[in-house]
Amino acid sequence: MIQMQTNLDVADNSGARRVMCIKVLGGSKRKYAGVGDVIVVSVKEAIPRGRVKKGDVMKAVVVRTAKDVKRADGSVIRFDKNAAVLINNQKEPIGTRIFGPVPRELRARNHMKIISLAPEVL
């Protein structure tokens, strides 16, 4: 469950290391984002020669949350930390690699490029 002011790790090689959610997209009064939702983030920490720099405002897809994700079969999946992947306006990832596992709920949200780049889909 991601809301405004939440800090997230970045799970790609775009150059950002840590971002902060500044808006949850998808409705004027929407408060929370879960796995697969698009949010607007501000880059808080970045590596020196990355594609993005500190202070950039980007869109991102939430790929891991510490809050449980309930599945139709009754099972739940949760991660240790919140993480996101930075995307452009065409909803394609900015980085060329994805780090760590991603849940298969991203497939239902049409984030196929992230699924294909991920080393493991849970």
UniProtKB/Swiss-Prot annotation:
Pfam families: Ribosomal_L14. CDD domains: Ribosomal_uL14 (cd00337). SMART domains: Ribosomal_L14 (SM01374). GO terms for biological process: translation. PROSITE patterns: RIBOSOMAL_L14. One of its GO terms (cellular component) is cytosolic large ribosomal subunit. Keywords: Ribonucleoprotein, Ribosomal protein, RNA-binding, rRNA-binding. Belongs to the universal ribosomal protein uL14 family. Binds to 23S rRNA. Forms part of two intersubunit bridges in the 70S ribosome. Part of the 50S ribosomal subunit. Forms a cluster with proteins L3 and L19. In the 70S ribosome, L14 and L19 interact and together make contacts with the 16S rRNA in bridges B5 and B8. This is Large ribosomal subunit protein uL14. The gene is rplN.
